[in-house]
């Protein structure tokens, strides 16, 4: 059995984001073209499909950590604020984006609420497990060193 931990994160996130986009279970909001992803950012994201990439990355973080709340997830996507000549300070990412994506992922059936925060549902686990299995198969065709994971 291939775990998400053994698959390169960039390949997994891109694969899952394409899958989420093709399924059309997550609605891309109108404001996603104009919004910054946190107070520490100066510009909006360059990638037009950033909302699906963020959703896939959130699913991966939930898989690895078990459960996360909105505040802790926003600190995962935070950064440091450039305050000119003064010292940098830590800042959280946008909680409204995370809240929106949690609601959309709950509607799609990939995330469920728990008393400790949000966690992956069995459907979300299956999505990530199948994606990691497909990626390892693709990597094994190119490099025989990945055969041991199949």
UniProtKB/Swiss-Prot annotation:
Asked if the Swiss-Prot or TrEMBL record annotates the protein with the keyword Phosphoprotein, the reply is no
- What one GO molecular function would you report for this record? RNA binding
List the InterPro entries hit by this protein, alphabetically: Ribosomal_eS19 (IPR001266), Ribosomal_eS19_archaeal (IPR027548), WH-like_DNA-bd_sf (IPR036388), WH_DNA-bd_sf (IPR036390)
Sorted alphabetically, the keyword list is: Ribonucleoprotein, Ribosomal protein
* One Pfam family recorded for the sequence: Ribosomal_S19e
Alphabetical GO CC annotations of the entry are: cytosolic small ribosomal subunit
Q: Which domain of life is it from?
A: Archaea
Q: Name one GO biological process term.
A: translation
Q: Does the keyword field hold Repeat?
A: no
Family under the similarity heading: Belongs to the eukaryotic ribosomal protein eS19 family.
- How is this protein organized at the quaternary level? Part of the 30S ribosomal subunit.
Q: What does this protein do?
A: May be involved in maturation of the 30S ribosomal subunit.
This one is known as Small ribosomal subunit protein eS19
Origin organism lineage:
Archaea, Methanobacteriati, Thermoplasmatota, Thermoplasmata, Thermoplasmatales
């Amino acid at each position: 059995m291939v775990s998400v931990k053994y698959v390169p994160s960039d390949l997994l996130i891109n694969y899952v984001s394409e899958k989420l986009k093709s399924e059309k279970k997550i609605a891309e909001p109108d404001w996603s073209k104009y919004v910054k992803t946190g107070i520490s950012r100066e510009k909006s994201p360059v990638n037009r499909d950033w909302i699906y990439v963020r959703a896939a990355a959130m699913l991966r973080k939930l898989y690895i950590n078990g459960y996360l709340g909105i505040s802790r997830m926003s600190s995962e996507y935070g950064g440091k604020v450039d305050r000119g000549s003064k010292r940098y300070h830590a800042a959280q990412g946008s909680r409204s984006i995370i809240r929106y994506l949690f609601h959309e992922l709950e509607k799609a059936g990939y995330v469920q609420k728990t008393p400790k925060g949000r966690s992956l549902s069995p459907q979300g686990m299956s999505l990530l497990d199948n994606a990691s299995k497909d990626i390892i198969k693709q990597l094994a065709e190119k490099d025989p060193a990945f055969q041991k994971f199949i």
